[in-house]
From Swiss-Prot:
SUPFAM superfamilies the UniProt entry points to: F-box domain
Protein name: F-box protein At5g03970
Record-annotated F-box domain positions: 18-66
Phylogenetic placement of the source organism: Eukaryota, Viridiplantae, Streptophyta, Embryophyta, Tracheophyta
Organism: Arabidopsis thaliana (Mouse-ear cress)
């Protein structure tokens, strides 16, 4: 189906279509629907099955999202612990009473996911992309879970063993083929001897197989294990030792990995990566007194870090005395928690067990209400990452003939959309 073609008469002139003809022409309906704002589009999927098929089609979705920025709904926050990953010298194992995949729910969808019991089957959190969730138990079992269909798929077992690694999930959206995904595993070597190679194994949903490759770097490189990276338009950003960021373009035929120094190289308490609204990499850090957020931009042919904003926590709470008094933030440490998805003017911060949103333009702080076992979490030893879902109707990612395992059903696909 072409989203731009117009119905024409035999003389090549656009015809005066009747209402009935317009409603029964997919091409004409596409041209009308693409002019409507997202909040209207989300309601129109309920009109008929045919309208849902048009709106959920890869062609229309790709064209529409090129015109209108996609909205993302916060489902909740996953609590990620690296204490039990890899081979532990001290033999530490997760206690039975401690969940492997805790979710601090902020939405009705998150509540249903938590109550469905599916999180108990997926292992540990690894990464997410547009709501698609990557979890597993290193180094053998990895699962993908789609919130739109409540289905999960187990990936084939990787062919290469990495003692320590970092992983990323890459979602792809083609106007012709629709959604697909890739999973990238990269080896992390603790003590490299001037190694300029990084071993990588990639799974593609298009081929349903793992492929092995070695990436070349122009300087010695050692990736940081078990740390969440960031994927922007197929480019993977991973933390590397020595205050660096490794950059790997998964779409490039060149088997290389680049490196850029972070704007600050000290050992800060918190370091997070994110994406700006124009598709650039964001880097944020915080210590006990301040936080900074930087943007990676290309100036000519050189990548440079530019400071977006710097916030003094003491001054911030002074401007938000009502919130500070309510949650007694004066006597507790404040930290940068995470960056918003494709936004530069909002960040998540944490003070004790409370999560807040800081608005950089208005300098205001608002509390984030969530459900979860906040009192039992060891916050200082866990990474808390936001879990977003793109609020857009889509066709199932996993086909019926894909490898599935039983999933408790919940009504997540129809609850709480923006």
């Amino acid at each position: 189906m072409s989203c731009s073609a117009r119905l024409k008469t035999n003389l090549g002139m656009t015809s005066a279509l009747s209402t009935h003809e317009v409603l029964n022409s997919n091409d004409t309906m596409c041209e009308i629907l693409i002019l409507l704002p997202p909040e209207t589009i989300y309601k129109l999927i309920l009109v008929s099955k045919r309208w849902l098929e048009i709106i959920a089609s890869p062609c229309f979705r790709h064209t529409y999202l090129a015109k209108w920025k996609p909205n993302f709904e916060l489902i909740g926050f996953f609590v990620c612990s690296s204490m039990y990953l890899g081979r532990r010298i001290d033999g530490t194992r997760r206690p039975r009473a401690e969940p492997s995949l805790p979710l601090l729910s902020t939405s009705s969808i998150g509540d249903e996911i938590e109550s469905s019991g599916i999180l108990k089957k997926l292992g540990y959190y690894i990464d997410s992309a547009d709501g698609l969730l990557l979890c597993g138990r290193h180094p053998k079992a990895y699962y993908l879970w789609d919130p739109s269909t409540q289905k999960q798929q187990q990936l084939p077992r990787p062919r290469v063993h990495f003692e320590e690694l970092c992983m990323s999930l890459i979602s792809e959206d083609s106007p012709d083929q629709g959604f697909s995904y890739k999973v990238v595993r990269a080896e992390c070597v603790a003590f490299p001897v001037n190694s300029t190679k990084v071993k990588v194994e990639t799974f593609s949903s298009k081929t349903s197989t793992w492929s092995y490759s070695e990436l070349i770097c122009l300087e010695p490189l050692s990736l940081s294990p078990w740390t969440p990276g960031r994927v922007i338009k197929g480019v993977v950003y991973w933390h590397a030792r020595g205050g660096k960021i490794a950059i790997y373009d998964s779409n490039s035929e060149e088997k290389r990995i680049d490196v850029i120094k972070l704007p600050k190289t000290y050992d800060y308490d918190e370091q997070v990566l994110g994406e700006t609204d124009d598709g650039s990499l964001q880097y944020g850090w915080s210590n006990k007194s301040v936080m900074e957020v930087w943007k990676l931009e290309k100036v000519g042919n050189v990548l440079e870090w530019n400071l977006l904003f710097k916030v003094n926590f003491k001054a911030m709470w002074k401007m938000n005395q009502a919130v500070a008094t309510r949650f007694s933030t004066w006597t507790k440490e404040t930290q940068l928690l995470a960056l918003f998805n494709q936004k530069s003017d909002l960040v998540y911060i944490r003070c004790d067990t409370q999560i807040f949103i800081y608005h950089t333009e208005t300098k205001r702080v608002e509390v984030v209400q969530y459900q979860g076992r906040k009192s039992t979490l060891v916050w200082d030893f866990n990474k808390v990452v936001p879990y977003f879902r793109r609020t857009w109707p889509c066709s199932p990612l996993f086909e019926n003939n894909a490898m599935m395992i039983d999933t408790p059903q919940c009504n997540a696909s129809s609850a709480g959309s923006n």
